[in-house]
Amino acid sequence: MGEWTILERLLEAAVQQHSTMIGRILLTVVVIFRILVVAIVGETVYDDEQTMFVCNTLQPGCNQACYDKAFPISHIRYWVFQIIMVCTPSLCFITYSVHQSSKQRERQYSTVFITLDKDKKREDNKIKNTTVNGVLQNSEFFTKEMQSDFLEVKEMQNSAARNSKMSKIRRQEGISRFYIIQVVFRNALEIGFLMGQYFLYGFKVPSMYECNRYPCVKMVECYVSRPTEKTVFLVFMFAVSGLCVILNLAELNHLGWRKIKTAVRGAQERRKSIYEIRNKDSPHRIGVPNFGRTQSSDSAYV
């Protein structure tokens, strides 16, 4: 049960800041109707699954062969594998968002340190402008130097603020895109496991199986323990998987297309701004004079 608790906390961290209301409802469905039910009820129902699978034969190995034919993979193990695989995109999203947040903090710290260093230099110049060897100095050189340092620090602060804002916008766009991608993958996994459950088990667990698989020498009848209880559990897990698929589609409809359009529009605007900056810089590049031959060198050829 401790392993499931760790998984629950990780899933809560995944949707704490970046998920929608539908995503939080989906988390409740996954945690309560899947993890808790499989961990508490499923282990009790399927505890004696193989030991109570009895066939009316004494042939060695026949019971195991017929059980393998009836249940290629145990219900409870299939659902545990389904939970792990469906939660994997959310865990990848946690890793990505934490990495982006740490990168953003590193950028902010580096900007603060550079600004503080420039402020310190400006204060040193101010002290130097005030007294030199105990004599008051008001020279124009120190005043201009201090003004240039002040303008440089101010420009750096404004540039740092703009860069921080742009990096924050890019980070939010990247997190939104990654969130949409993980919802798409999660829904694809849900549909795949739902179809796999249908083809493996159907909607009913029969009380008796007929088996003639080797090493059985003839057709034998095998009996399953708690068939009605397992049928109810099977239908319940079908319903939970179907509900998760519907919630994933609703979440994509709620934020997916809108955020996809916003992300595409933002990428187009960034490309447009870069193109405009390059066009503004191109006249300056063309108008640069050629310093290869000066006027004095030209007059030497006259």
From Swiss-Prot:
This is Gap junction delta-2 protein. It comes from Leucoraja erinaceus (Little skate). Its main location: membrane. It is found in: Cell membrane; Cell junction, Gap junction. A connexon is composed of a hexamer of connexins. InterPro entries: Connexin, Connexin_CCC, Connexin_CS, Connexin_N, Connexin_N_sf. One of its GO terms (molecular function) is gap junction channel activity. Residues 43-75, 201-232 are extracellular. Retinal specific. One of its GO terms (biological process) is cell-cell signaling. The chain crosses the membrane at residues 20-42, 76-98, 178-200, 233-255. GO terms for cellular component: connexin complex. It is a multi-pass membrane protein. Belongs to the connexin family. Delta-type subfamily. Keywords: Cell junction, Cell membrane, Gap junction, Membrane, Transmembrane, Transmembrane helix. Pfam families: Connexin (PF00029). Residues 1-19, 99-177, 256-302 are cytoplasmic. One gap junction consists of a cluster of closely packed pairs of transmembrane channels, the connexons, through which materials of low MW diffuse from one cell to a neighboring cell.
